[in-house]
């Protein structure tokens, strides 16, 4: 009593406290960073190693395996995957959430150093690592085009200057430059000219390497001067290499230009990049796992004027893709939704109280509570994101509830003629415990979320804490500022009989009278109501089992990502044509704004594309509808497939799959994996629940096997090392020397000129110089035959792995897809040597599915414990919790009605409903218990009177929560697909709960009261007719 009086009778102090909360909140709001979702990125590090010319199997066994054994000893590694292709190995390390990325990077470097002695010689450089997830979509893509500069020169400028500058921006984790490669001097050998001159390929390589050296020469000095010695020991251009003498034939000098074409070109000619219809160099920028995407993008944009200033006039630098506009638009939509929710809630209060002064009180209390929450968010290190702003939107209905309960009770005393200050004090005292019970039990709902681990726990933590803080501030405001404003602003009202003449008041009175009549009938037919209650419990269980489920709603971020997979024997020239054809099909779609792509590198038959759609307001279709439309057109392209998927704000795992979800096959036997993977993939492709089924197992590439006749080789004076060196020199794009320039280092690349390697007959032109100096054709000691070979070898842990990726057809949920896959695997009878499991997002979904029911039960149990402590009773909490089944039925039916799967967002809605709907029961039970204690009423009379007296605040709080969530349901702008499931769940649950709990709660209250009396061996009081 004195606590409430302290604030009621000291209005200046109370106002200043509220002002301080508001000012701190405004400051926190201005300092809060902006993000699409809470920070949930796993720490990921990518290790890269190269050995040009080495086969995928060689890379896997000699490079990947030693590194994996060393890296696998690092603490905190959640998953380790590797992919080895022609001349390249990439290992992805995904760490636990609590692992510091900088400490992990130090451990990775130490592991690389430890494995160095086990790696093969001939590697052009040591393995390197980068702190970025290659499977993440770039946050920004910049393109460089030029009419006069070559692609190699553009690539050199981009990688040497632009990429280095961008990498220094805070938040940038990796700048991947694609579309070409660094400049190089390429030596294209003529096999016939070499044979005629009697020059081996090794001799050419050694001559080039010896002619281009960079060694210190020292200095000469006398008593006065010192001269540094400098020589022309380096060759830097193709023109300087051409006259190089590599051999003497009968006293005549054989120069490099006599047996080879020497050109200024690039290290790897099998690379191509495009933006729309023009050749381009792409700078694909990814953020650090812990970085904020908006702050990082803003930092890059702020740097663009400086970048453009350093670019020559012949180069055009453009932003091809930027993830931030849709994120900003989505957050703006949420902020507008929040404003609409506040307005609707205030409107509900006005319609019920029919007083401008009374409405002003919650109109002040709600903003103070919401704005004050921003200060706590900043102190907790949170961000303004879709989930935290959705929490505040939903909190609008919660924070007004506390004010409504206090305000309505004070207004009731004023209508009875009590003086304002006395009414404020008395009314607050009567409902103070009720408000505290409602708030504490509501916060208790979120305790299990705060203790939840893994990705879902990290994702929901900001939501739970933000909402809990808003409720806590609301509790303080409703017990201090609200009664003070009531005492000083409101006046004694007209008698209720006069208010009934007004429109809304007359409707409310009519509803209350109708409710009273129907409640009398219900209390005389309790068994029927009991059957209905048990029916809702059973229906909850059936609906939860039957409803389709998914992990997270499919977002429309306005960005698509596509992976091209062509025939495994395709050439680079043909693959570049496929890239152009696919880009033309996509560019012609009316919903597409920009498209970029690249192909080449170690995987000739693959490519990547990034598509930016037009803003949501400029296109009629969602991203998924655009994909469905393009899928039909793209399927007509022969010899290759393009798999499109909408970029999501949450992507789990480090695999670069060509679809959103993955199922991984593991085996210790590579042969068993290669036998069963095609069978499983074929069976999964036939499932209607899956779309775009594809695999990263590529073991059908064209290969030419050379079989050495070792006896013949020994007789001819040739060893295997010389033969292998011949092949590497001829066909491996071998980097044989380094050119040092002030800004970068470039390579000299040697191979047989592509003009002489158009078919297999090129092998017949190869020869080896034996120990006697004679040229021995390769065909003398080797036979060759075509065969199939892998284009890549994949590992997970230390086991051979193959990942089958898939998308979901429109109207199919992830739970339906995973159930179909599990069923198919059982039907196929896959042997135990081949193990299958979901990975990435699908794996997290499986884990979340297993914990959802536990989480709901834990929330209910926590609320029960809190209510039991507050009421000092085992029974009354059960009465209050009896409101939950009807809310669950309403929520699940609403999701089914809107064809929305049960997702993590819908789970949040269910958790919120646990907190919302029990408020009705708390208000009923509190007044019933007080009436029994102080008024001497029977349980039947007490609960009946409580239901009628609390009908108006129950309607007000329910409608306030409903109207607070309604804008989430009706929103259709950017990010609406994320907000709608939450609104649908809450609105559906509130409607059904309001219809049923007004009747089931009194019946359950009486049931438990009679049960209590029976167990305490007391005679029940006779039922009093109402």
Curated annotation (Swiss-Prot):
Report whether Membrane shows up as a keyword of the record: yes
> Could you list the residue ranges that cross the membrane?
15-35, 333-353, 360-380, 387-407, 431-451, 463-483, 528-548, 853-873, 897-917, 953-973, 984-1004
List keywords of the entry alphabetically.
Cell inner membrane, Cell membrane, Membrane, Transmembrane, Transmembrane helix, Transport
Topology in the membrane? Multi-pass membrane protein
Question: What subcellular compartments does it reside in?
Answer: Cell inner membrane
Main localization category: membrane
Question: Can you name a GO cellular component term?
Answer: plasma membrane
The protein's matches in InterPro entries, at most eight in alphabetical order, are given as: AcrB_DN_DC_subdom, Acrflvin-R, Multidrug-R_MdtC
Q: Name one GO molecular function term.
A: xenobiotic transmembrane transporter activity
Task: Share what the entry says about its subunit structure, partners included.
Answer: Part of a tripartite efflux system composed of MdtA, MdtB and MdtC. MdtC forms a heteromultimer with MdtB.
Family of this protein: Belongs to the resistance-nodulation-cell division (RND) (TC 2.A.6) family. MdtC subfamily.
Q: Record's HAMAP family? A: MdtC
Q: What is this protein called?
A: Multidrug resistance protein MdtC
């Amino acid at each position: 009593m004195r606590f409430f009086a302290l604030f009621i009778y000291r209005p200046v102090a109370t106002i200043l406290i509220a002002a301080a909360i508001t000012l701190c909140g405004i400051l926190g709001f201005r300092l809060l960073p902006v993000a699409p979702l809470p920070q949930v990125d796993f720490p990921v590090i990518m290790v890269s190693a190269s050995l040009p010319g080495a086969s995928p199997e060689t890379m896997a066994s000699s490079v990947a395996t030693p590194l994996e054994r060393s890296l696998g000893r690092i603490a905190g590694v959640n998953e380790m995957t590797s992919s080895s292709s022609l001349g390249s190995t990439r290992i992805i390390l995904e760490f636990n959430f609590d692992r510091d990325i900088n400490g992990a990077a130090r451990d990775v470097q130490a592991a690389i150093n430890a494995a160095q002695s086990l790696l093969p010689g001939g590697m052009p450089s040591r393995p390197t690592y980068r702190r970025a997830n290659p499977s993440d979509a770039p946050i920004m893509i910049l393109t460089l085009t030029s009419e006069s500069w070559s692609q190699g020169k553009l690539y050199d400028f981009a990688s040497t200057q632009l990429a280095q500058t961008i990498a220094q921006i805070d938040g940038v984790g990796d700048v991947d430059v694609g579309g070409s490669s660094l400049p190089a001097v390429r030596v294209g050998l003529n096999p016939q000219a070499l044979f005629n001159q009697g020059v081996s390929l090794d001799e050419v390589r050694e001559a080039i390497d010896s002619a281009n050296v960079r060694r210190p020469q020292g200095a000469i000095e006398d008593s006065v001067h010192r001269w540094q010695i400098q020589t022309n020991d380096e060759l830097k251009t193709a023109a300087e290499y051409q006259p190089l003498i590599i051999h003497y034939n009968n006293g005549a000098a054989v120069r490099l230009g006599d047996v080879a074409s020497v050109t200024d070109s690039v290290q790897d000619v099998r690379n191509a990049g495009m933006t729309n219809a023009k050749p381009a160099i792409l700078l694909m920028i990814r953020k650090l796992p812990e970085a904020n995407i908006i702050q990082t993008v803003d930092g890059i944009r702020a740097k663009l004027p400086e970048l453009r200033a350093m670019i020559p006039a012949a180069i055009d630098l453009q932003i091809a893709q930027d993830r931030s506009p849709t994120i900003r638009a989505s957050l703006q939509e949420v902020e507008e939704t929040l404003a609409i929710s506040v307005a609707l809630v205030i409107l509900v209060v006005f319609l019920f109280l029919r007083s401008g002064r009374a409405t002003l009180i919650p109109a002040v209390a709600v903003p103070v509570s919401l704005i004050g929450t921003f200060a706590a968010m900043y102190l907790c290190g949170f961000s303004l994101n879709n989930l935290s702003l959705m929490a505040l939107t939903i909190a609008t209905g919660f924070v007004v509830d506390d004010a409504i309960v206090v305000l309505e009770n004070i207004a009731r005393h004023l209508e009875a003629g009590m003086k304002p200050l006395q009414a404020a004090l008395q009314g607050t005292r009567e409902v103070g415990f009720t408000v505290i019970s409602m708030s504490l039990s509501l916060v208790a709902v979120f305790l299990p979320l705060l203790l939840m681990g893994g990705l879902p726990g990290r994702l929901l933590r900001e939501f739970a804490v933000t909402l809990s803080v808003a409720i806590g501030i609301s509790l303080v405001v409703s017990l201090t500022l609200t009664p003070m404003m009531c005492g000083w602003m409101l006046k004694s009202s007209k008698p209720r009989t006069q208010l009934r003449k007004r429109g809304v008041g007359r409707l409310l009175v009519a509803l209350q009278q109708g409710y009273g009549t129907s409640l009398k009938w219900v209390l005389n037919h309790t068994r029927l109501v009991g059957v209905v209650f048990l029916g809702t419990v059973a229906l909850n269980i059936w609906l939860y089992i039957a409803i389709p489920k998914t992990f997270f709603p499919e977002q429309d971020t306005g960005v698509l990502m596509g992976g091209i997979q062509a025939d495994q024997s395709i050439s680079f020239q043909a693959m570049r044509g496929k890239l152009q054809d696919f880009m033309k099909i996509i560019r012609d779609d009316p919903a597409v704004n920009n498209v970029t792509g690249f192909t080449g590198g170690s995987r000739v038959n693959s490519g990547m594309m990034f598509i930016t759609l037009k803003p949501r307001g400029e296109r009629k279709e969602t991203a998924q509808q655009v994909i469905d439309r393009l899928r039909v057109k793209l399927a007509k392209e022969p010899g290759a497939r393009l798999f499109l998927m909408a970029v999501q704000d949450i992507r789990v795992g480090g695999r670069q799959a060509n679809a959103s979800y993955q199922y991984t096959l593991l085996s210790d036997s590579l042969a068993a994996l290669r036998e069963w993977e095609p069978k499983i993939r074929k069976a999964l492709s036939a499932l209607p629940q899956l779309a775009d089924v594809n695999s990263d197992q590529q073991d059908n590439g064209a290969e030419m096997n050379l079989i050495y006749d070792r006896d013949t080789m020994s007789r001819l004076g040739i060893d295997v090392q010389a033969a292998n060196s011949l092949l590497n020199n001829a066909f491996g794009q071998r980097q044989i020397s380094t050119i040092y320039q002030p800004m970068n280092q470039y390579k000299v690349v040697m191979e047989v000129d592509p003009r002489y390697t158009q078919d297999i007959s090129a092998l017949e032109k190869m020869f080896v110089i034996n120990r006697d100096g004679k040229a021995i054709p390769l065909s003398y000691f080797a036979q060759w035959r075509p065969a199939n070979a892998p284009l890549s070898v994949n590992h997970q842990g230390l086991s051979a792995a193959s990942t089958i990726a898939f998308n979901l057809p429109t109207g199919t949920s992830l739970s339906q897809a995973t159930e179909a896959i599990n069923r198919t695997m059982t039907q196929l009878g896959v042997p135990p040597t081949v193990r299958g499991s979901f990975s990435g997002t699908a794996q997290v979904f499986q884990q979340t599915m297993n914990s959802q029911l536990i989480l709901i039960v834990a929330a209910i149990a926590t609320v029960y414990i809190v209510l039991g402590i507050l009421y000092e009773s085992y029974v009354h909490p059960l009465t209050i919790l009896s409101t939950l089944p009807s809310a669950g039925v309403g929520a699940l039916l609403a999701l089914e009605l809107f064809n929305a799967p049960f997702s993590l967002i819908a789970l949040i809605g269910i958790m919120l409903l646990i907190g919302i709907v029990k408020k009705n029961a708390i208000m009923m039970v509190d007044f019933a218990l007080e009436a029994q204690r102080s008024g001497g009423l029977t349980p039947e009379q007490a609960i009946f009177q409580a239901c009628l007296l609390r009908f108006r605040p129950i309607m007000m709080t329910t409608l306030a929560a409903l109207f607070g969530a309604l804008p989430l349901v009706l929103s259709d702008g950017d990010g609406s697909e994320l907000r709608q499931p939450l609104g649908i769940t809450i609105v559906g649950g509130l409607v059904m709960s309001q219809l049923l709990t007004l009747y089931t709660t009194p019946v359950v209250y009486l049931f438990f009261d009679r049960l209590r009396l029976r167990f305490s061996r007391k005679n029940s009081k006779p039922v009093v007719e109402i």
